[in-house]
Amino acid sequence: MPEPTAPDAATRGALHHVELWVPDLRRATRSWGWLLTELGYTPFQEWEDGRSWRLGATYVVVEQSPGLTSAAHDRTRPGLNHLAFSAGTRADVDRLAEACTEHGWALLFTDRHPYAGGPDHYAAYVEDVDGFEAELVATDP
């Protein structure tokens, strides 16, 4: 088997994109757009039913597809539970957790925050109005 070329080796297996089908594009653009921008993503694509934001080679899409079969996402059912993002320092996680409520997010697991993922895992778990969860993970010790 031939050795992969440098570009393939650098990107093979990397996440290319994530597409979230949402019941309300305007609401999702407000919440996800704010969060992704805060995490360093930049607007990438825009069309009638969707938007995307890109960081490096990876992008996140929110789309209000006419093919939706339900108006609600339930992260506790089979399928996607949450997206986890490296969010910078603990101070960055704290700042995002505090600001999230102004942008369509609610802090989850408040009784265990910021250690809901365990004593060695500093993170904020947030959920938008449509039930999508994001985990904001501190990358400093």
Protein language model features and the residues they cover:
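Vicinal oxygen chelate
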Residues: 2-11, 15-23, 73-99, 101-141
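Long, continuous compositionally biased terminal/linker segments
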Residues: 4-9, 55-88, 92-95
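A generic structural signal for ordered secondary structure
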Residues: 52-55, 84, 90, 100-103, ...
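Alpha-helical elements of the RecA-like P-loop NTPase motor core of helicases
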Residues: 29-30, 94, 134
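Core segments of cupin and vicinal oxygen chelate
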Residues: 12, 19-64
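N-terminal beta-strand motif that seeds the catalytic metal site of vicinal oxygen chelate
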Residues: 1-29, 83, 140
